[in-house]
Amino acid sequence: MNLTDYLLDTFNYNDQTNKKLLDKINLIDDKNECIKLFSHLINSQYKWMARIIQDPKAKEMSWWEPVYNFVELNCEWTKSLQPWITYITASTDEELSSEVTFIGFDDGLWAATPKDIALQLNYHSIHHRAQMQTIIRQQGIEPDFIDYIGTKYRKLS
């Protein structure tokens, strides 16, 4: 599997599991913390893409704001994901592995590869998905099995 396919597969898994998670969040009474965390995942995708494309507004973009209404999360998630799918699909492995620069939290000049930023977004999503799964469980709802292997393995006998 080449790098482009790997990253697209990772984003696809992340997309599927986050949308399943939204279905569970819909069942709980106190959604506030899950909404904040899910909004943060959306905002992170927007901010990191803005950094990659050298958007001058990237520095002012918040990791945590806006906090979307629950009913907006699915649509906003998809909107935040699409630029990543487009960017990865249009990029070569060499481009995905070449450093881009951006202004960091401390106004310093930082560098990272788009590949590593893409992986960060997906791994970061796993971290916050686990937090949301815990919140769901604490409110008496059994979370779905969303492990990556569950999308890949097959029973033979």
Segment roles from a protein language model:
Residues 8-65, 106-157:
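Short, contiguous alpha-helical
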Residues 58-98:
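Helix-adjacent hinge/juxtasegments
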Residues 48-50, 95-100:
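Short acidic/polar alpha-helix capping motifs at helix-coil junctions
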Residues 7-8, 71:
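Active-site rim elements
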Residues 2, 6:
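Short Lys/Arg-rich basic patches
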